[in-house]
Amino acid sequence: MTAIDVPWLSTPRRDNSHGTRSNSSCQPSCTQRIAVPISPDAVKYPLAVFCFAWAVTLGAYLDSQELVIGFAFHGWDGDTSIPSAGTCRIRIRPEQEILPALDEVVADGDKGLRSWVAQGAGSETDIAIQRKEVGDSLHPAVHGDEKLSPEIIITPSGNQGPYHVQGRFDPHIVAPALAHMMLHQFAFAVQGIVRGQSSIASSQVKDLQAISPDGMAQLMRWNRQSAAEEDGACVQDLIQRTCQQQPHAMAVCAWDGSWSYQELDCQASHLASQLCDHGIEPEKFVGLLFEKSKWTTVAILAVLKAGGAFVLLDPTQPAAYLSAICTMTRTALLLCSSHNQRLAAELRQTTIQVPRDPYHGAMPTSDFRRQSSPAVQPHHTLYACFTSGSTGRPKGFIIDHVAFNSGLQTYAHATGLGCDSRVFQFASYSFAPSITDQLASLIVGASICVPAEEELQNDVEGSISQLQATWLKLTPSVARTLDPGRLPCVKTLILVGEEAQVSDVAAWQDHGITVLGLYGQSENAKGTMVSRKSSEDADPGNIGSPFCAVGWVVDPDDYHRLMPIGATGELLLESPCLCRGYIDNEDETKLAFVSKPSWLTQVRGQGTAQPLLRTGDIVRYNCVDGTFCLVGRKGNRVKLRGQRLELAQVEHHLRSCLSSTHPVLADVVQPANENGRDPMLVAFVPWADSQSAADATDGFFAPPTKDFQTQARAVLGRLRHLLPSFMVPSTLLAVRTIPRTGTGKIHRRRLQEAASMLSRKQLMAYISPFIPYRAPETELERKLQRACGRLLNIEADQISMQDNFFDLGGNSLTARQLVAVARAEGLQVSVAQIFQQPTLAGLAQTHRHPVRRAEVPRSSHDPDPFGRVRDDVRREGLPHIARGNIEDALPVLYTQMTTARDHCVDFFPLRVIGGQLDPEQLRLAWTRVIQAFPILRTVFPRFRGRFIQLVVRDIGDSNFYRVVEAPSGQTAEEWARALCTEAIQFRCPVDRPVAQLTLIQAAGSSALVLRLCHAQYDGSCLEHLVRSLMMAYHGRPLVVESDFQAYTRTCLRLRIPEVLDFWRRFLAGSSPTQLASSMTGDREAARKINRSFFRREVNSLAAPAGFTLATVVKAAWSWVLRNETRSEDVVFGQLVSCRGSVPLPHADTIIGPCMNIIPVRVGRDLLGAVQAQHAQTMEFDMIGMDEIVRHCTSWPAGTEPDSIIIHENFHVDWEVHDGGVTIQKIAAVFNQQPSSLTFLITIPTETGLIAVLMAPANMSSTHADRVLDLFCNTLTRLAWSPAAVLRRSE
């Protein structure tokens, strides 16, 4: 209990049956005295007046309207008609007039004061009225030999007064400063009652609970220190000043490159001129749709230079949510990165991609001036930001330049932000702190450190260290995942969003790091209060003092009434940093922004017109120093993991998804026995069916049924496309009846309390079916079980390997923590894998520990069992290749064989942005890359009738690098596409070097074309290849941890009995499913005719609970094959990536085709079989299809799967930034050879996937369309209602 808490009135209780005190070790030891300047003769009914005044005072501090007061009344002229001691129960009605209220106290039934008997209810405090000083103790009839805290002793000083009031309190429970303030408030109440007795004018009881004159005087002293003035500058002007003062200082240091202040200014000026051409001017919004990137800062500054206002759009949020934001702000233009082009298209806005085409000619000047529209004024809009709203729409507000700049220097000083700070840009773009971190840093001359999104998910600590960030702004939950000892670069930590514990602060302070707390509202730019945290803080809830605002504590239900100092109330904020109000929401604005409270007019005068913000936060003053302590939130506003949300907005979308006219509620619930863990957002849905009625009990909740689980999962899936993830409930509960209060209102608290009696597993059972317990079977599984138990505060043996990590209480934050803990145990997992395989069993299958692969035998006396191939080739020789030029020779892998056989040579045009590349420097860089990666020097000749991969030492100078001038009138990119389209028509021999880089130059632009055989690459390695090229171009060393030769040797060594036996068992009695058998036309003839392409886009798609999207794709295709071929047992092929399977260091950076085609076999159980097979085959997925057919089946030699699934779960579009130059992948040109096989390619998107069917020539277009439609429809049904599809398939 802290010294500011006041549940002290209920500590000692009178035992009703014996009339004596309970034992209490709490002894009053702090005495406070004041004088009440009224005459005793003026007080009628002194006992009633003083008891009523004390009850009114306590009611204000306790927020209570009914109190029991113990009293002693003695030594008063020997009047024995009044009881000497007893208790009285007093009800406080704030709207009641004072005199009638006092009359009720006096009258209290027919007997008046004489009904207050000593045998009454236990009192909550004691008050004594005595004629003269009789010592420090109360009348013995009140408490015998024991003491009670607090005690009030009132003694008159003669007939003329004043009264002397003495209060005695336990200082461990009531701080002396608070006790002093309470006595002044008591004196104020007494005077008000006395005036009410003699005055004709009516006053209300609530007027007695308003702040006392002494309290107001103290407030004015404190608030003079917080007074703030407006700053009339514009943000872009302040940033421009920084750019001029320190042009060569680092402005942005990001994962994708960096900008000096001069470079930033130039880039932003160039983009600003384009924005002006699109009509951007003051009060027009530009939406910024970027992932974490250095280009976000450029876009922000460009919009400001053009005179416009910006709104940051977080690409992780649903398109519908972002579209609503664009509509509300009337967005005139959208700037987006190439990675977010598809999402931008869904928002249907005019869009400019950033970075765009390279500059024409020299770097643009930074001397940008607006000529075509009025100059930007400080009152113009700076940005809009959005939070959770109560109407079902996002709640947006506008911050202007004045609001942001006012108090900025005070903010910087208070938070330790200066020109030497390196600010870690952690906050999501959907939250206001991300904007402050950008703009404030640029104004003071700091460096903005921008991590990659992947690093924020998987390795925050490593990212901070790599960027050498010195200034962090994190929630305490995130800070707990970091080890300050491994971050010597950090100097300042700002904790936001949640209450920090003493242990949070101590962990960082022990390493000499300054820890501060920042409290504020998004509607108040930059934040409101800063507190210096200490491991010795008595009250972790202390949020400090305002740095550019004045805070007032008012009655939560009546902002015209200031609360006494030390009492809790709603924080009302007066500040020049406030926003203008809520966009297109006048009702919400009127509720939140209030003008001219009556008390403020008395303080400021009639000229006060600035609105004040009702924050919704319940706070109280620290009576010692005027700082604020945060107590909680008001009404239906809640905070979950540091993020504010309106329950009404969640409920609006729930009703919409459920099409319900019944009340649907949402609330934050703390599951049973989970103190210290994150609570859950839970939805309560009315539900009644026959099973619920049959199982009816006295409880609120119906038992979970399959039908409810299916509907609940579907609703959550729809919500994920409408709301940000933190606003989507973790579960839905089936409620038989909604409880109501006596007045008919919904009784939220009873529902919340009932749900809090359930465990997390019981809560999650409403969306997930019951799964029997499975104990861990391997050491890997036991490690994961222990790690989850430690992170989630659950006994390890209570966790089943079939449990869903997120159903156990995991979230995106604990997923990051699990990655860190797992890596400490030597387990390589990522956040993405946790989301894809949320069960512990699935996660254990995803991880490939090197020890397991080490079991693959390798002859000790023959370090390279394939060396004989190289020796034989050197001895026998090959045409066109000198023996001395042969560096290595190996058998080809299965996918290499198929692509070399079909002469698959592909072309990749690459856009160059940011400057011209030097041709000679690029040639030398490409030479270094070819020497570093042997696969680029590999050719694929036939040797003894079979393809081999042969690595040559020197590929020659004739064709590996070219420089081409684009014809006049064509850009480099246009000519690159033309060259690729022409070159693809010619067959390129693969028994000679294929890898080639072409530099295309045009006036003011350049482009690259990369030519590779598909036997040399896969889609995952192209970005790393181009990144290595740019590293070599800028003179940095190339580090190759593993190459494709090592990968090939590892795969070829897997021809061992264990692996072959697995595939024999797996494929026993099967045969490849021939989709072509249902087609018309000659299969052999189809091998010579080009294939046709058919494309569909599937939106609003999410995998069912416990399954991945890849599993659903394969299950849907297997259902299509069953439907087309009438076969119960189907076998098809799947292209898999083996980078996660091979036990080689940094396998993700290998340049080469680390992929394979393996068979997929599915019986009647679609989803379950596919998911199980995925886990089983990962141990054996590096053996080629030809080896499987030859050694593990009775199929004819050369059998291939008739249809092959390719699920591209990697980034198809990418760009590489290095040294001010950006290389951007654009549409590739593939050499599509004729084939009789059917390929289904699925590419995940933000909201679903794109499906492409590559049909052989003997499949008619009508048939192909029907097959693809059937696949897409099945895919959608499986995602939304797998049970329905499975029932239909039986």
Curated annotation (Swiss-Prot):
<feature type="modified residue" description="O-(pantetheine 4'-phosphoryl)serine">
    <location>
        <position position="812"/>
    </location>
</feature>
<dbReference type="InterPro" id="IPR000873">
    <property type="entry name" value="AMP-dep_synth/lig_dom"/>
</dbReference>
<dbReference type="GO" id="GO:0019184">
    <property type="term" value="P:nonribosomal peptide biosynthetic process"/>
</dbReference>
<dbReference type="InterPro" id="IPR023213">
    <property type="entry name" value="CAT-like_dom_sf"/>
</dbReference>
<keyword id="KW-0597">Phosphoprotein</keyword>
<keyword id="KW-0843">Virulence</keyword>
<feature type="region of interest" description="Adenylation">
    <location>
        <begin position="260"/>
        <end position="657"/>
    </location>
</feature>
<keyword id="KW-0677">Repeat</keyword>
<dbReference type="InterPro" id="IPR042099">
    <property type="entry name" value="ANL_N_sf"/>
</dbReference>
<dbReference type="GO" id="GO:0019748">
    <property type="term" value="P:secondary metabolic process"/>
</dbReference>
<feature type="compositionally biased region" description="Basic and acidic residues">
    <location>
        <begin position="852"/>
        <end position="870"/>
    </location>
</feature>
<dbReference type="InterPro" id="IPR036736">
    <property type="entry name" value="ACP-like_sf"/>
</dbReference>
<dbReference type="Pfam" id="PF00501">
    <property type="entry name" value="AMP-binding"/>
</dbReference>
<feature type="domain" description="Carrier">
    <location>
        <begin position="775"/>
        <end position="851"/>
    </location>
</feature>
<feature type="region of interest" description="Disordered">
    <location>
        <begin position="846"/>
        <end position="870"/>
    </location>
</feature>
<dbReference type="InterPro" id="IPR001242">
    <property type="entry name" value="Condensatn"/>
</dbReference>
<dbReference type="GO" id="GO:0043041">
    <property type="term" value="P:amino acid activation for nonribosomal peptide biosynthetic process"/>
</dbReference>
<dbReference type="GO" id="GO:0016874">
    <property type="term" value="F:ligase activity"/>
</dbReference>
<dbReference type="GO" id="GO:0031177">
    <property type="term" value="F:phosphopantetheine binding"/>
</dbReference>
<keyword id="KW-0436">Ligase</keyword>
<feature type="region of interest" description="Condensation">
    <location>
        <begin position="914"/>
        <end position="1162"/>
    </location>
</feature>
<dbReference type="GO" id="GO:0044550">
    <property type="term" value="P:secondary metabolite biosynthetic process"/>
</dbReference>
<feature type="region of interest" description="Disordered">
    <location>
        <begin position="1"/>
        <end position="27"/>
    </location>
</feature>
<comment type="similarity">
    <text>Belongs to the NRP synthetase family.</text>
</comment>
<dbReference type="GO" id="GO:0005737">
    <property type="term" value="C:cytoplasm"/>
</dbReference>
<dbReference type="InterPro" id="IPR009081">
    <property type="entry name" value="PP-bd_ACP"/>
</dbReference>
<protein>
    <recommendedName>
        <fullName>Nonribosomal peptide synthetase 6</fullName>
        <ecNumber>6.3.2.-</ecNumber>
    </recommendedName>
</protein>
<keyword id="KW-0596">Phosphopantetheine</keyword>
<dbReference type="Pfam" id="PF00668">
    <property type="entry name" value="Condensation"/>
</dbReference>
<comment type="function">
    <text>Nonribosomal peptide synthesis (NRPS) is a key mechanism responsible for the biosynthesis of bioactive metabolites which are potentially contributing to organismal virulence.</text>
</comment>
<dbReference type="Pfam" id="PF00550">
    <property type="entry name" value="PP-binding"/>
</dbReference>
<dbReference type="InterPro" id="IPR045851">
    <property type="entry name" value="AMP-bd_C_sf"/>
</dbReference>
